[in-house]
Every structure is written in C-alpha cells, then in structure tokens.
Amino acid sequence: MSTPELSLPAHLLPADGRFGCGPSKIRPDQLAAIDPEVMGTSHRKPAVKNLVGSVREGLSTLFSLPEGYEIVLSVGGATAFWDAATFGLIERHSAHLTFGEFSTKFAKSAAGAPWLDAPSIVEAPAGTVPDVGDLSAEADVVAWAHNETSTGAMAEVTRPHPRNDQQLVVVDATSGAGGLPVNIADTDVYYFSPQKCFASDGGLWLAAMSPAALERIERINASERYIPNFLNLQTAVDNSRKNQTYNTPAIATLL
C-alpha cells in the first residue's frame, strides 16, 4: 500500500521557516541587547563574569534551586555534555530511556566508553515514551530526555528508585527547560542548551546540579580515570563558581 503524500495548506504553515524542533527565533529585543562593551571582551574580565553570574543567578531563581544545588555551565552545548557525563558522571553503569534521536545519543556515548559497563537501555518507538520505572535499579546513573526534541514526546521527571541514594537522575532538558514544569529536587543533573525555550543561540550547556552530582564529579575527577580538560566536569564546576567558563564562551548566547 502506498503512503499518501501530506501537504499542509499555506495558512497553517509557520510564517518563519525556522519554526520547528531546531533553534527558536531570537526575540528582536534580545538582538538589540547585544552590548558592544561586552562582545569581544575576555571572559576573565568583570563585564563577562558579571554576565555569567547574572545568568546563573537568574536560572537559580527560575528553577527554585534546592539548598546545595548549583548552576554549572560550559562550552559545547548538550552534545558536549553527553561526552562530559560519560567521562565524569557515570561511575560504572548507566541506564537510559531512548525514544528518539536525541535521547539515543547519550546512550550511544556511554555504550562507546571502554571504561564503563555496557549501559542498560529501555527503548520505545519514536513518538511514545517508555516507563521511567523500567530503568535499572542497579545503575549509578539513569538518564532520559524531559522532552524528546526529535518527536516532542514528553517524559515525566521523577526518581525511579528513590531508595537508591547512589543513583543519579540525569535529565536532558534542552527542548523542555523553561517551558515544562519540573521539580529540580527530583533530578541530580537537569541540563540543557539555551536555543529552545530560552530563545537564545547555541554553543553552551547549562545544568542544575545536586550536591550528590557535585560529589560524584569530584570523586571521579580525583580517580585515575583519564578525562580531557575540555570535557572535565570538575573544571566546569570550578570555573562556574567563579562565574567563568574553562574557555571563551559564546558571549552573544549569554546576552
């Protein structure tokens, strides 16, 4: 049986072709706010550090961060974060919900790491969402997307095994953060790039991290595991606490 071709009528098409699961259109007010006094400035200078500090403070307020949680940021977007988490957040074994292109990518990163055990994967067809409760109780990291960018399918954010205090809940919120309700206390790492709901540009990752996640990062960093400097989460934490990034950030994205 042949598949019929679907065609949307012109009045239903978005006025701007950038509408979709890609980056959001940036508001004119934000484009006008690009400050020549900040653009092209060293990220070690007060002007940029103050900007980073204001972003961290604003996100802390937006998400009503519980005591001990911190906003951490670095360069490279959520794609870089998957590799950074593979190096510096997963201790031995992770479990993943995969239900689209983006939730699958973190699982692939973990599967390719020879220093980790093979990840447990709970898969569901694109457009549907697997059950968070099916994630392994033995995994030291459980991971999924709050909103699967490629399909729009939304998963709940909750701790699947709350009695396991060694299990970190790591949620990709790139196309959900700022637009979907969340209790950050139900996560240990709620990470995202800002080019969706925040209508910024790409190039950075930001994350709300729990004390347990911060402790895990510090412990793995102190071990004998090799971690590239660019992907070192402890480096990101240390710099964020100084309102900096390890290397030059996309300043326009922060603005």
How would you name each of these model-derived features?
Residues 95, 140-145, 170, 191, ...:
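Structural motif
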Residues 184-195, 205:
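Conserved active-site segment immediately N-terminal to the catalytic lysine
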Residues 1-43:
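N-terminal "arm"/small-domain region of PLP-dependent enzymes with the aminotransferase-like
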